[in-house]
């Protein structure tokens, strides 16, 4: 069955490129979520006044990749202990988050993060919320690293080869 989850972890360019290489991920689109402005521009989001975060919508086939696997991948490519910062990207629009629409996913996500939290004394800074809104980003941001392969990316794209069950 095709399901969707929305994730944030710094600049959305690298997150999208990474998840596009995961078997079972059918489609990704980058955008802005959880904010208080309808259809914000990138420039507005960068002012940190809209409360949006750069987010990737991931549509996946759960026969080939599980939500747990997607969460494991996210956890390995971000610094889960960092607030409003990933790599060189700093600001509330770069905060880490997992956003869901399916109530069953909420339990899976919270259980996953609780298990991770129990393995470390550091506080995990990934917000978990029901998706309130998602506005698709400008076209030039879509598949940005495919169009601009030498651009900055905070994500180690080679980690996508690791499999999680």
Curated annotation (Swiss-Prot):
Q: Name one Pfam family in it.
A: PMSR
Q: Which GO terms describe its cellular component?
A: cytoplasm
Q: Name one GO biological process term.
A: cellular response to oxidative stress
Q: Extract the InterPro entries matched here.
A: Met_Sox_Rdtase_MsrA_dom (IPR002569), Met_Sox_Rdtase_MsrA_sf (IPR036509), MsrA_MetSO_reductase (IPR050162)
Main enzyme class? oxidoreductase
Catalyzed reactions: L-methionyl-[protein] + [thioredoxin]-disulfide + H2O = L-methionyl-(S)-S-oxide-[protein] + [thioredoxin]-dithiol; [thioredoxin]-disulfide + L-methionine + H2O = L-methionine (S)-S-oxide + [thioredoxin]-dithiol
Q: What is its EC number?
A: 1.8.4.11
| Active site annotation, chain numbering | 11
Keywords assigned by UniProt? Answer: Oxidoreductase
> What Gene Ontology terms describe what this protein does at the molecular function level?
L-methionine-(S)-S-oxide reductase activity; peptide-methionine (S)-S-oxide reductase activity
Hey, which family's this protein in? Belongs to the MsrA Met sulfoxide reductase family.
- What biological function has been recorded for the protein in this entry? Has an important function as a repair enzyme for proteins that have been inactivated by oxidation. Catalyzes the reversible oxidation-reduction of methionine sulfoxide in proteins to methionine.
Q: What is this protein called?
A: Peptide methionine sulfoxide reductase MsrA
Q: Please tell me the species this chain comes from.
A: Ureaplasma parvum serovar 3 (strain ATCC 700970)
Q: What is the lineage of its organism?
A: Bacteria, Bacillati, Mycoplasmatota, Mycoplasmoidales, Mycoplasmoidaceae
């Amino acid at each position: 069955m095709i399901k969707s989850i929305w994730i944030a972890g710094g600049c959305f360019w690298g997150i999208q490129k990474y998840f596009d290489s995961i078997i079972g991920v059918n489609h990704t689109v980058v955008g802005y979520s959880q904010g208080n402005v309808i259809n914000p521009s990138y420039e507005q989001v960068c002012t940190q006044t809209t409360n949006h975060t750069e987010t990737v919508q991931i549509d996946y086939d759960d026969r080939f990749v599980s939500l747990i696997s997607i969460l494991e991948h996210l956890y390995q490519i971000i610094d889960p202990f960092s607030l409003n910062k990933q790599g060189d990207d700093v600001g509330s629009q770069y905060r880490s988050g997992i956003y869901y629409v399916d109530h069953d996913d909420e339990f899976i996500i919270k259980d996953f993060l609780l298990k991770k939290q129990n393995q470390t004394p550091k506080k995990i800074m990934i917000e978990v919320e029901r998706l309130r809104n998602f506005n698709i980003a400008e076209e030039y941001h879509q598949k940005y690293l495919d169009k601009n392969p030498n651009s900055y990316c905070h994500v180690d794209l080679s980690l996508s080869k690791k499999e999680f069950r």
